[in-house]
């Protein structure tokens, strides 16, 4: 095999079949080692053919090879392998008695670790992972079907193929001692695995009994019945190889893995993952360019993943450094009209995050951003889009101040008050937050208008001090504190500032008491809560 491995491409399946048959009959460890070495040699020269064969069945050779975890083994690596040199066999200590297996690629991975040095190991893993990634790309869920008349069993078998590729990547990466072989492939691995996660979120494992051959490869794994979890565990294995442990700890602490697996929170999980990867310095321009194309993908899941990724990325100046900010911002403006409400929500979040990542660009294109987010308030069929637009507008108006907001100030204020009594607590909280920002940002031009608006909204603000949702109640307190100067209610403003530890009921009682005192003739304060210029009135 050492002299002819390069010439036997056509015979690879036959050779592996012979090894498959003979391995259980081998009684001597030495002979098994020779067979494993033969498989390793074939894989070095014909990785595609070997991978195809390995994915077909649960290889008995896995029973005879121990696949250590990422931290197992303290021995120094062997001398580098180079083409033409004899491959060193695994030590006997690495081959325990027949026992459990961690997957079809375990034997191959351990053989590589034993016989592959710095050059051979990198060459092998690079080639091996590239073949797996290419196969996974070609099996993408958004690829058109070649035939609509496939038997159900064939369709379910085809659905298992990406999962087997994903599992293979996990096993190979987990068996490596050095991260170098994976680190330089990370910009290519990340989009492949993110795409697989997006394709499997909310899905179940194919259940056809005729698909058992493919399921053998996944059998015994913790995520047997959850294809998305399998993809997430593979991504975690890759990141564990490349990143410092503190970043993996942070992902777990923030609940990123659980969110990524949940169809209702997948977008938030992508934001958490992107934020950690940014801080770890693993977001690169090639990854950004790949995900840019996903924004217009036929798959809604891919568009959600891409929109959430860029919503978080908008917080950082990296897009400006790569000269990608303008096309991405333009794409997010367009995505506010996407058919997916989650995509629209993430687009609004991304535009709001321009405040942190590119405030000068926000000021330059403030008209388009304000108008787009104002239109988002009209998306009443999707409460999450409206809430995100309200919060984004709060950030944008705070940055621009009232003068730069222009005539849109009036439209935003009128639209915002319509959500004070919304059924969803997230809408009420976001509306109170934005209303307080509008009060703080109102310039002389808009003070008279805003005072008139408060004539119809102050009662609602007071009542929602006792909002059943704690977040909405706190946001209402902040808004009322900022609106109090427009009403001439100095005592109310002072009471809100001083009594910060009162319960909602106690605070409401205190504010009502202050209102009664303010309305009493001859007392400090106006005769009513709506002292617009040139107007009187009572509360």
Task: Give the predicted meaning of each segment.
Residues 34, 53, 68-71, 107-111, ...:
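Alpha-solenoid helical repeat scaffolds
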Residues 2-12, 42-51, 66, 78-86, ...:
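Flexible loop/turn segments at the boundaries of HEAT repeats in alpha-solenoid HEAT proteins
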Residues 22-26, 60-64, 98-100, 138, ...:
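Short coil turns that connect the paired helices of HEAT/ARM alpha-solenoid repeats
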Residues 7-23, 48-64, 84-96, 128-136, ...:
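HEAT/HEAT-like alpha-solenoid repeats
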Residues 1-2, 35-44, 72-80, 108-119, ...:
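Hydrophobic residues within the alpha-helices of tandem HEAT/HEAT-like
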Residues 170-274, 288-290, 490-493:
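Alpha-helical repeat/alpha-solenoid scaffolds of the HEAT/ARM/MIF4G superfamily
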Residues 30, 132-160, 200-225, 251-257, ...:
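Acidic, Ser/Thr- and Gly/Pro-rich intrinsically disordered linkers and low-complexity segments
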Residues 1, 27-32, 66-74, 101-112, ...:
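HEAT-repeat alpha-solenoid elements in large eukaryotic scaffold proteins
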